[in-house]
Amino acid sequence: MSKVYDWFQERLEVQALADDITSKYVPPHVNIFYCLGGVTLICFLVQFATGFAMTYYYKPTVAEAFSSVNYIMDEVSFGWLIRSIHRWSASMMVLAMILHTFRVYLTGGFKRPRELTWVTGVLLACLTVSFGVTGYSLPWDQVGYWAVKIVTQVPSAIPVVGDLIVEFLRGGAGVGQETLTRFYSAHTFVLPWLTVVFMLMHFLMIRKQGISGPL
């Protein structure tokens, strides 16, 4: 084992990296509420793993989406557990994100020089809500269908470009297969990649600037 370690140490200096990760100074005022960002990250990782597992069985078509979800729940081994964990962790992620945002705001963590950290955090909050909106529609049941219809109709109130936004979100004039395809693509590809990018930026800035001091 030591030979493997020595091989990596010689080439990558892994000990210096490990020391940097494990020896970061933590201010004495930090309490359990400062862990809410980490809880949000853990929920995202659980979402990623369980969501990836369900893509093996889910069929993103208006004719088969609902039946494929039922198949996951009733026929796939532990499918009911995987989907339930996905739903529970989604709710927990939203809750942790909201509490984390309030904690940062109330403790002044958004102030100079951490403005960009706050901006990336707000963008991550928007992405989290977008996950909920797009994921809610994927079973394509009555609740999901009408939720999509209402949500995609909201931008129509915007002057000039409102109707164009609605058509872009729906993939056409009405809600149908094109809408489900776009929401599925956003939920499983676009939003996860954007979240990873902004999370990386968020964490790198936190590592660079450290945790904000007490009020």
Curated annotation (Swiss-Prot):
<dbReference type="GO" id="GO:0015979">
    <property type="term" value="P:photosynthesis"/>
</dbReference>
<dbReference type="InterPro" id="IPR016174">
    <property type="entry name" value="Di-haem_cyt_TM"/>
</dbReference>
<feature type="transmembrane region" description="Helical">
    <location>
        <begin position="90"/>
        <end position="110"/>
    </location>
</feature>
<protein>
    <recommendedName>
        <fullName>Cytochrome b6</fullName>
    </recommendedName>
</protein>
<comment type="subunit">
    <text>The 4 large subunits of the cytochrome b6-f complex are cytochrome b6, subunit IV (17 kDa polypeptide, PetD), cytochrome f and the Rieske protein, while the 4 small subunits are PetG, PetL, PetM and PetN. The complex functions as a dimer.</text>
</comment>
<dbReference type="GO" id="GO:0045158">
    <property type="term" value="F:electron transporter, transferring electrons within cytochrome b6/f complex of photosystem II activity"/>
</dbReference>
<feature type="binding site" description="axial binding residue">
    <location>
        <position position="202"/>
    </location>
    <ligand>
        <name>heme b 1</name>
    </ligand>
</feature>
<feature type="binding site" description="axial binding residue">
    <location>
        <position position="187"/>
    </location>
    <ligand>
        <name>heme b 2</name>
    </ligand>
</feature>
<keyword id="KW-1133">Transmembrane helix</keyword>
<keyword id="KW-0602">Photosynthesis</keyword>
<comment type="function">
    <text>Component of the cytochrome b6-f complex, which mediates electron transfer between photosystem II (PSII) and photosystem I (PSI), cyclic electron flow around PSI, and state transitions.</text>
</comment>
<comment type="similarity">
    <text>Belongs to the cytochrome b family. PetB subfamily.</text>
</comment>
<keyword id="KW-1003">Cell membrane</keyword>
<feature type="transmembrane region" description="Helical">
    <location>
        <begin position="32"/>
        <end position="52"/>
    </location>
</feature>
<dbReference type="InterPro" id="IPR005797">
    <property type="entry name" value="Cyt_b/b6_N"/>
</dbReference>
<keyword id="KW-0249">Electron transport</keyword>
<dbReference type="GO" id="GO:0005886">
    <property type="term" value="C:plasma membrane"/>
</dbReference>
<keyword id="KW-0408">Iron</keyword>
<dbReference type="InterPro" id="IPR023530">
    <property type="entry name" value="Cyt_B6_PetB"/>
</dbReference>
<keyword id="KW-0472">Membrane</keyword>
<keyword id="KW-0997">Cell inner membrane</keyword>
<dbReference type="GO" id="GO:0016491">
    <property type="term" value="F:oxidoreductase activity"/>
</dbReference>
<dbReference type="GO" id="GO:0046872">
    <property type="term" value="F:metal ion binding"/>
</dbReference>
<feature type="binding site" description="axial binding residue">
    <location>
        <position position="100"/>
    </location>
    <ligand>
        <name>heme b 1</name>
    </ligand>
</feature>
<keyword id="KW-0479">Metal-binding</keyword>
<feature type="transmembrane region" description="Helical">
    <location>
        <begin position="186"/>
        <end position="206"/>
    </location>
</feature>
<dbReference type="InterPro" id="IPR027387">
    <property type="entry name" value="Cytb/b6-like_sf"/>
</dbReference>
<dbReference type="GO" id="GO:0016020">
    <property type="term" value="C:membrane"/>
</dbReference>
<dbReference type="InterPro" id="IPR048259">
    <property type="entry name" value="Cytochrome_b_N_euk/bac"/>
</dbReference>
<feature type="binding site" description="covalent">
    <location>
        <position position="35"/>
    </location>
    <ligand>
        <name>heme c</name>
    </ligand>
</feature>
<dbReference type="GO" id="GO:0022904">
    <property type="term" value="P:respiratory electron transport chain"/>
</dbReference>
<feature type="transmembrane region" description="Helical">
    <location>
        <begin position="116"/>
        <end position="136"/>
    </location>
</feature>
<keyword id="KW-0812">Transmembrane</keyword>
<feature type="binding site" description="axial binding residue">
    <location>
        <position position="86"/>
    </location>
    <ligand>
        <name>heme b 2</name>
    </ligand>
</feature>
<dbReference type="Pfam" id="PF00033">
    <property type="entry name" value="Cytochrome_B"/>
</dbReference>
<keyword id="KW-0813">Transport</keyword>
<keyword id="KW-0349">Heme</keyword>
